[in-house]
Amino acid sequence: MIGNDPLDLGGQIAFVTGAGQSAGRAIALALAKHNAGGVAVNDFVPERAAAVAAEIEALGVRAVAVPSDVGDYAAVKAAFAAAEALGPVTLLVNNAGNAGPNASMGRSPNFWETEPGDWDRYFRTNLQGVMNCCHVALPEMVKQGKGRIVTVVSDAGRVGEAKLAAYAAAKAGAAGFVRSIAREAGRFGITSNAISLSALEPPMDDEAKAAFLASEQAKLITSRYAIRRMGRPDDVAAMALFLCSDAASWITGQTYPVNGGYSFAQ
């Protein structure tokens, strides 16, 4: 989509983490549809990264699958090196996250029932992963004199969430990091903003998703929102696209709730 598109990305190269499914996939596709010059698709699962890269190429946009564990600094450096085949990365979306397999079901253990190794897993992906990607991406952005960094955080980091203490702490740390980078990098034409999410529809097949959304657990979750539904991947992608575009060129250090009104509807 080019021409009079106010969200036209001007052929810039994007690197999206956690892009193999759900919101990350939607973000990668949205950037491709709005004139990104190429998209580096990063995901922990190589097959998912490759599948989304193929979807983007089918749109006529260059893409490369660059799978890695974002918590592994050496792996992140290698992923960015592979992305250089597309050109210099000036759009970074830190979407990769880990809340644990049972978070949306309310079956995570109490904090005092967890082990330190559990905390490490949450901090590795949700905070260290963001720092790793920014540390590798920023030198090139500074060299280019421009850049957009968008980081997905969580309402859990702002208000707290029972049975997700380590996850909430990591996401709160990421939100603080976003603001610090905004202060450091702004003079180089680089913005740093965050999107704060609540619960998204789980990445299931249509039948399983319909069953979950009709469940009492899903109804309990959505009862906390002014808009009585769970978030959808495209909801997140729309905000990420805006923050990556020139329409947001004088916005930095901000955290935008994309949460159906959870911020005030409790």
Regions of interest found by a model, annotated:
Residues 1-5, 159, 219, 223, ...:
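Short C-terminal tail/terminal secondary-structure segment
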Residues 154:
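Residue(s) in the substrate-gating loop at a strand-loop-helix junction
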Residues 186, 191, 196, 251-253:
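Short, small/polar-rich loop/turn modules that mediate ligand/substrate recognition or access, typified
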Residues 2, 6-40:
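Canonical Rossmann dinucleotide-binding motif of NAD(H)/NADP(H)-dependent dehydrogenases/reductases
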Residues 90, 98, 112-131, 146, ...:
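Catalytic Tyr-X3-Lys loop
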Residues 77, 99-120, 143, 163-166:
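Conserved mid-core segment of classical short-chain dehydrogenase/reductases
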